[in-house]
């Protein structure tokens, strides 16, 4: 269940990276994934490549932080295992919910959200899911780039269609946060926190993020593309490139689940949450979200357009997902779409 980047998403600037990526990288990676030594001659025969082409593919692996061990007379062997996605394992972990989904696993792409937004406009089926081993231009909120490296995180998007349209999607990112938190707890990660409106934290460090893009009529049928990135096992180079404190599942769960198992659990929880959200909105998830609220009753500031906008006490969220901010002027309702929000503690906590 693997494919290549397709459609209009290939015209964006990061597609240049895809075009020049060594096309033999993933076939080579799968050959070496057994942990055994393979000679250059064996690799060339299996891949139909010259020794020179094998060398270039090896170099491509090194650029992804997967430099194989080379031993004269024996060949190449990966020094660490690579946790690639397996459709059958995802389906097993997802259970009965998997019947409602249509999963596609890509080796690499610019952005799963970009691909699925294009698919949504072209009539892609409800429940379509695109997951990717290596995302080259993953997007977060406010135009930030999501970084995880090859097989260092889960990067995937789901298309969910709603009869009620965009007007009924208030609080969707918070409900999705509840689904991700439930799945992480199933996977053995205790102490998951939620940050309004769309981050998953642990001990104040970012563990996962959500990006939702919508389309359709304000009061008619609509669709949401739900992009999720979860840090599963970040290498040192990726951590260094991220401009905020981060943590990964491998550092929190013992034993850590495979990426396939974790993806299956997240998809299962998403189907349950989105089905209920379609009927009742965010209200049924409000109390559960607030129990995990990272900044409940703390003094916070919200930043809009990169400068200080408003400060107050985070009192929780309303039934439509609005942040309730207490101040000397009373309680303000902050709607996710109104501000570019970056909640930061003001009391040193």
Mark where each language-model region is.
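Long, positively charged amphipathic alpha-helical accessory segments at protein N-termini or as interdomain linkers
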Residues: 12-13, 17-50, 56-59, 63-64, ...
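A local structural micro-motif
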Residues: 69, 192-193
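Positions that flank functional sites
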Residues: 76, 199-200
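Active-site glycine-centered loops adjacent to acidic/histidine catalytic or metal-binding residues
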Residues: 138, 199, 229
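Alpha/beta catalytic cores of group-transfer enzymes, especially the acyltransferase/condensing modules
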Residues: 194-198
């Amino acid at each position: 269940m693997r494919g290549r980047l397709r459609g209009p998403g290939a015209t964006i600037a990061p597609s240049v990276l895809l075009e020049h990526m060594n096309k033999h990288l993933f076939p080579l990676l799968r050959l070496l994934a057994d942990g055994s030594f393979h000679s250059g001659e064996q690799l060339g025969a299996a891949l139909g490549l010259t020794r020179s082409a094998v060398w270039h593919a090896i170099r491509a692996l090194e650029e992804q932080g997967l430099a194989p061990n080379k031993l004269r007379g024996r060949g190449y062997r990966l020094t660490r295992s690579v946790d690639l996605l397996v459709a059958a394992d995802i389906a097993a972990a997802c259970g009965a919910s998997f019947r409602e989904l249509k999963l596609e696993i890509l080796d690499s792409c610019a952005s799963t959200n970009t691909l699925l937004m294009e698919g949504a406009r072209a009539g892609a089926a409800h429940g379509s899911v695109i997951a990717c081993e290596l995302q080259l231009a993953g997007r977060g909120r406010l135009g930030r780039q999501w970084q995880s490296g090859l097989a260092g995180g889960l990067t995937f998007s789901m298309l969910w269609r709603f009869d009620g349209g965009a007007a009924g999607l208030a609080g969707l990112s918070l409900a999705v946060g509840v689904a991700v938190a439930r799945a992480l707890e199933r996977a053995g990660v205790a102490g998951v926190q939620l940050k309004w409106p769309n981050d998953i934290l642990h001990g104040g460090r970012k563990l996962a993020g959500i990006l939702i893009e919508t389309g359709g009529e304000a009061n008619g049928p609509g669709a949401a593309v739900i992009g999720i990135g979860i840090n599963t096992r970040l290498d040192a180079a990726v951590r260094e490139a991220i401009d905020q404190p981060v943590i990964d599942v491998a550092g929190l769960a013992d034993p850590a689940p495979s990426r396939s198992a974790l993806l299956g659990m997240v998809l299962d929880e998403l189907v349950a949450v989105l089905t209920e959200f379609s009927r009742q909105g965010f209200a049924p998830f409000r109390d559960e979200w607030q129990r995990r609220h990272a900044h409940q009753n703390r003094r916070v500031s919200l930043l809009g357009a990169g400068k200080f906008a408003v400060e107050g006490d985070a009192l929780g969220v309303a039934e439509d997902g609005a942040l309730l901010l207490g101040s000397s002027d009373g309680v303000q309702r902050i709607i996710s779409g109104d501000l570019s929000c970056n909640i930061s503690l003001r009391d040193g906590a």
